[in-house]
């Protein structure tokens, strides 16, 4: 938990919802490297407007994204069996409420999360 760099393999399936969040206070960069499968990495401004949408798929030569500190972001998994390698500066800091986007549904609201992810795909 106190390591200077945190690394995690994460296996994800379509329908997995990662609420939009940021890493602020402490400010941390985050890197996603897609090892298998594909996903959309989506960045937002403070009002929830999409500022960037990046399709990551190693079969197409698009492997990863580095997300700057304090930038709102989420992912939408596109392919079954997707595996990502996440790298973030340590030490571990759990997400606090101010770092979860108030303009997006919470993880506990499955239907709203499904609708949100569908909307992200249609943009």
Model-derived regions: residue spans:
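Extended, positively charged loop/linker patches that create polyanion-binding surfaces
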Residues: 41, 45-66
């Amino acid at each position: 938990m106190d390591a200077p760099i945190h690394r995690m393999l994460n296996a994800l399936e379509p329908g997995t919802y990662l609420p939009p969040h940021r890493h602020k206070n402490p400010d941390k960069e985050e890197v996603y490297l897609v090892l298998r499968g594909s996903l959309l990495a989506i960045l937002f401004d403070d009002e929830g407007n999409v500022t960037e949408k990046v399709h990551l798929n190693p079969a197409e030569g698009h492997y990863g994204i580095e997300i700057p500190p304090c930038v709102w972001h989420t992912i939408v998994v596109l392919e079954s069996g997707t595996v990502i390698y996440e790298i973030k500066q340590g030490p571990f800091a759990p997400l606090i409420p101010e770092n979860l986007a108030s303009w997006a549904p919470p993880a506990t609201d499955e239907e709203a999360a499904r609708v949100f992810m569908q909307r992200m795909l249609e943009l």
